[in-house]
Amino acid sequence: DERVFRYNESAGITTLDPAHSRSLELMWVADALYDGLVELSPELEIKPAIAKRWEWDEKGVVFHLRKGVMFAKQEDIIGLEGGREVVASDVVYSLERLRDPEVASPGEWILDAVQEGGIIALNDSTVRINLDYDFPPFLGLLTTPYASVVAEEAVEARGSNFRSKPAGTGPFKLAFWEENVALVLHRNESYWERDEQGVQLPYLEAVHIDFVPDMGSEYLGLIQGRYDFMSGLHPAYMEDLMDLNGGLAEKHKADLNLRRIPFLKTDYIGLLVDDNTLLGSPFLDVRVR
């Protein structure tokens, strides 16, 4: 089916709870299942999502929610059997959940500038977030999957099972997940976003993700047409795929496309300098560091 996008995720998927989407593979799936107040465009610019607009003032930022953003249907959850429109209290719950010690979200830090009790639903369509200090990068932090809006009744009813039974507003919804085997997402028929011609998104009917840890098998799947996409190619396969000028090898030009696009990524090198655990370590010497 040309409307099914297939790829392999060699690192696997450990959770579908956006509060724990700390790695790239988890972020990709969270972006398919959930929306936040704002999101990044393909050009890495902040654009509206669940929030149609916002304004800053001396206290922080006020978000105005768009109408018609629906949670995907959840037949086992009272109130979500036919889906439900997102309201401001859902935003408050989702963000405050990051601070819940029982959730233990690694994304709690995105709220470091937010006042305690400073996430407020002014009415069903307006959310105020008060900051402790002026912090313009805050909007950028809200584009991360950590800030995704979830359905409170689904989280509370499912408890720890929410990691495998998500409830969001994204372009796709979960159809099947067998850990270490495959994950399948189906098109969310109630998704709110449309393209410039008014056509409802997404264009795809489904996304199929395999979890094959061997990169050689993944590359073979790409060459044989079982996968539509591969990122982060191992150097061992570069000679087969590409020519000396960095383009596609002639034998692959009829079947594959090579695209180079901007990619938002941060790497760092950390040096452990705790003298309680590294007695005698050269890293304790600032001249070495």
Predicted regions and their residues:
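Short, low-complexity disordered leader/linker segments with a strong preference
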Residues: 1-2, 118
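Extracytoplasmic/periplasmic ligand-capture domains
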Residues: 42, 60-62, 66-104, 160-163, ...
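Surface-exposed binding/hinge segments that line
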Residues: 55, 90, 103-152, 178
